[in-house]
Amino acid sequence: CACLVGSEMCIRDRYGITLNKLEGIPTYHPDVEVFEVKDADGSQLGIFYVDYFPRSGKSGGAWMSNYREQQGATRPLVCNVCSFTKPVGDTPSLLTMDEVETLFHEFGHALHGLLTKCEYKGTSGTNVVRDFVELPSQINEHWATEPEVLKMYAKHYQTGEVIPDEIIEKILKQKTFNQGFMTTELLAAAILDMNLHMITDVKNLDMLAFEKEAMDKLGLIPEIAPRYRVTYFNHIIGGYAAGYYSYLWANVLDNDAFEAFKEHGIFDKNTADLFRHNVLEKGAVSYTHLRAHETCADL
């Protein structure tokens, strides 16, 4: 997958990390590929599994999982699962920009799991407070659409032509298009999540009526629905109970943190080391060492 190659090139240029594909490793399905992740000094950071394509019986969506978490000298086994269109014959898997950002997002979670250096697995990798867990993933999305990075991996699948500047310009413009709508639907889902976790009496509860009442109180117009409705809001039973707001809070953190890279260059080694040592390795405890200030939730 060219996009995975692009993502790998980004971490190689930032951290000196390499992914080496392993053959003959037992996996739970033939579609799963396995990579050994090595640091700049050649030491092993962990094993990375990718399961990118849909199949019968596989859940849809995208996520990162741990088969073994880092603890002391024990290195992690990390997996990214996605639902991208499978290659057919000589035609490779072609991704939309949304899917490319999903790949970079989940790879950011994987980096968090692979680069962690904690004494106890209960505090390693993604085992951090929900307010913080989406920072490593969402900041990694920024590299997906940086012009310098797009030219590394975004090439015509038949001719090999590098993506032209006029298309890059359109990609950058669409990143800010309709953001008011997207922020509103995310906020609506976050508030719905909070309201669900303040229910005290579940007897004869009509969930759809509950959702409508909650949204009516917000004054939400019918044309804008919560990003996730009560009938399929998987996050609230998948580790984000009363915590879906963390995606929006992570937007504050990741934009602030990425400014550090923009100030010095998106592949600046010193900035990358600061982010690695104070955010990815230690998990949520040293953010101010990266930016030297607290972030603010005020709009």
Go through each PLM region and give its residues.
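Short, solvent-exposed segments of well-ordered alpha helices
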Residues: 1, 94, 98, 179, ...
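A generic structural signal for short coil/turn motifs at secondary-structure boundaries
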Residues: 88-92, 123, 201
